[in-house]
Amino acid sequence: MSLNPDLAAYLQLVEAGRSAGKVLPMHALEADEARRQFEESSALIAGKADEPDCISDLSLTTRDGHTLPVRLYRPPQDDPALAGAALLYLHGGGYVVGSLDSHDTLCWNLAQDAGVPVIAVGYRLAPQWRFPTASDDALDAWRWLVEQAEALGIDAQRLAVVGDSVGGSLATILANQLAAQRELAAPRLQVMIYPVTDASCRRPSVQRYGSGYLLEAQTLEWFYQQYATVPADRLDPRFSPLLGSVASNSAPALMLIAECDPLHDQGVAYARHLEQAGVAVQLAVIPGVTHDFMRMGSIIEEADEGLVMVVEALQQHL
């Protein structure tokens, strides 16, 4: 399958900038500069949410006393069939880049199209905060959401967790932790959008799509190195969920995978891993697109198609 032509044209522009020395690959940058450039490119490919009256900035306190930013997106019109339902969103960015702002449009579109509130959390980033900080922050965010549900007008029994890239990793790690611990209300649905599930090895799709398809193999490795405190961290299920056991009562899963993504093979492998544990899985491989396609609504139609799949899964399970 060939690349979507509009996406291919965008990648040609990216490559032209690199060849001219105007843009460096992310793995050649310091973390702060990588974040700045990621935010700039996010504004170009995704745009900006246009309903500020429906968006509120909040905060939560983690187990170690750190304050995390939270953004609440309320839909302009609720879906009566999903009264009280909501979702926690965990953004992507390799544990190093990404923010509430970089995923603002995607979260707003989810809230608007699904007709449910979306709560996005800005977990701490590497290398300043290394493994397992991000997964701890995700669990703390879930606890906060459950505890604040009534005050927010949300039903803690009608929640989903959604994330893209490493946010998808955090989403499934969280869903599995909650299913195993049985301490807090667990999500009714976990949605993983091109997640990282195995940082321990290189699968064939890394060779096929690790250069020239937006997410570079060298950048992926750089992300892993920035987040891991020691190399063995990459074998921990909170880093590589494919390497851990799965609770059979984990939430049903929707997984969206890009065909032309170095993470393709590990995503497919993780879907099978969940199925073998008895978890219901809907796997969709989107042809002709790369990693991060869900944030490319200003470039390709597949972003909207993926959004429809997520909304339909929310309607089915919540």
Curated annotation (Swiss-Prot):
This protein is called Ethyl acetate hydrolase
Q: What is the lineage of its organism?
A: Bacteria, Pseudomonadati, Pseudomonadota, Gammaproteobacteria, Pseudomonadales
Q: How does activity depend on pH?
A: Optimum pH is 7.5 with alpha-naphthyl acetate as substrate.
The UniProt family comment states: Belongs to the 'GDXG' lipolytic enzyme family.
Source organism: Pseudomonas putida (Arthrobacter siderocapsulatus)
| One Pfam match | Abhydrolase_3
Q: What is its EC number?
A: 3.1.1.113
Source organism, top-level taxon: Bacteria
Subcellular location, record wording:
Cytoplasm
Q: What Gene Ontology cellular component terms go with this record?
A: cytoplasm
Question: How would you summarize the temperature dependence of activity?
Answer: Optimum temperature is between 35 and 45 degrees Celsius, with maximal activity near 40 degrees Celsius with alpha-naphthyl acetate as substrate.
Identify the catalytic residues: 165, 261, 291
Q: Which reaction does it catalyse?
A: ethyl acetate + H2O = ethanol + acetate + H(+)
- Give the chief site where it resides: cytoplasm
Which is an annotated GO molecular function term of this record?
A: hydrolase activity
List UniProt keywords, sorted A-Z. Cytoplasm, Hydrolase
Query: Self-association or partners: how does it assemble?
Result: Monomer.
Free-text activity regulation comment from the record: Inhibited by the serine protease inhibitor phenylmethylsulfonyl fluoride, the histidine reagent diethylpyrocarbonate and two sulfhydryl reagents, mercuric chloride and naphthol AS-D chloroacetate. Not inhibited by EDTA.
Q: What is the role of this chain?
A: Esterase that catalyzes the hydrolysis of ethyl acetate. Can also use propyl acetate and the chromogenic substrates alpha-naphthyl acetate, alpha-naphthyl propionate, alpha-naphthyl caproate and 4-nitrophenyl acetate, with a preference for short-chain aliphatic esters. Highest activity is obtained in vitro with propyl acetate, followed by ethyl acetate. In vivo, could be involved in pyoverdine biosynthesis, but its specific role and its in vivo substrate have not been identified.
- Biotech uses: Ethyl acetate is an undesirable coproduct produced in ethanolic fermentation broths during the fermentation of sugars to ethanol. EstZ could be used to effectively reduce the level of ethyl acetate in ethanol beers produced with the ethanologenic E.coli strain KO11.
